[in-house]
Amino acid sequence: MYNVVVCLLTLSFLLLTGLSNTAEARVPYEAREGVWDQKVITEIKAEVGGSCSPHAHGRGPPNRPGSSNIPGSPKRCTKP
């Protein structure tokens, strides 16, 4: 019984001292002008454009006009 009490006290002490050490070690957050915001990310996505991959078109119906892989069928994507 004595060993259990000593172990619980020791673990509690280590836990509490560890929590205070991590709180002291945190680096304060400083916002800089170089941080990317949602506007910059949206502009980059608009410049890049979509993919010609048949797997990148989303969850639409599989039988859309121009989405067939049959030779000679019209292709929907004309990107280089």
Curated annotation (Swiss-Prot):
Range of residues in the leader sequence: 1-25
Q: Where is this region: Disordered?
A: 50-80
**Mostly located where?**
membrane
Q: What are the protein's UniProt keywords?
A: Apoplast, Cell membrane, Cleavage on pair of basic residues, Membrane, Secreted, Signal
Where does the protein end up? Cell membrane; Secreted, Extracellular space, Apoplast
GO cellular component labels: apoplast; plasma membrane
Q: Where is this motif: SxS motif essential for MIK2 binding?
A: 51-53
The molecular function terms of the Gene Ontology recorded here are: LRR domain binding; receptor serine/threonine kinase binding
SCOOP motif (motif): residue ranges: 45-59
How would you summarize the oligomeric state and partners of this protein? Interacts with MIK2 (via extracellular leucine-rich repeat domain); this interaction triggers the formation of complex between MIK2 and the BAK1/SERK3 and SERK4 coreceptors, and subsequent BAK1 activation by phosphorylation.
Could you tell me what this protein does? Brassicaceae-specific phytocytokine (plant endogenous peptide released into the apoplast) perceived by MIK2 in a BAK1/SERK3 and SERK4 coreceptors-dependent manner, that modulates various physiological and antimicrobial processes including growth prevention and reactive oxygen species (ROS) response regulation.
Q: Which family does it belong to?
A: Belongs to the serine rich endogenous peptide (SCOOP) phytocytokine family.
Q: What is this protein called?
A: Serine rich endogenous peptide 18
- What gene is it encoded by? PROSCOOP18
